[in-house]
Amino acid sequence: MNFYFELVAVFVAAVSGALAGRQKDMDFFGMYVVGVLTGLGGGTLRSLLIGDLPPPMFRNPSYLLVAAVAVVFARFGEPWWSKIRRVVSVVDAVSLGMFVSLGIRISQAKGLPWWACVVNGVITAAFGGVLRDIARVEVPLIFRREIYATACLAGGMVLLGLDALGLPKGIGVLIITVLITVIRLLAIRYSLNQSSD
């Protein structure tokens, strides 16, 4: 179950990365690199931290192939992206929610304590975006006042709470994916941020 869910999450995040690369006028190869970094960066770091070696992308070619399909989809679907920036934001928000739940579930399967599961959920969700923004020569969203990591953290805590209530795991994943997506989109829509004052 985790394998197929992760492939879907990789696809969604890689589309986000590829479109972000296209915003910077990158060619297909550049879009692919940024797509791979976005789709697989967070999961790879998570695997390194929990000792899941080698990381899945080096054990199964499906991950890189899915990223390639995502980039083709992003590149040739470009005529339909009337506002690429908005599409990137929406797709990125959806992938955040998916990756938080994925990182937490994989960490739970490794028997990690609850707080480590939440940390790994945030890392899985956010680190690909960090690499994407670095590749685009931008300050990563997570290091700005954007409600980004906070949304991931909140979603992770809610997921653990739903688990404690005995809710079916799949339902919990669906709920927090929607929750994190909505938080991010509201933050973008209404320019909500975390004040440094």
Give each language-model segment a name.
Residues 69-106:
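Ordered, amphipathic secondary-structure segments that act as subunit-interaction surfaces
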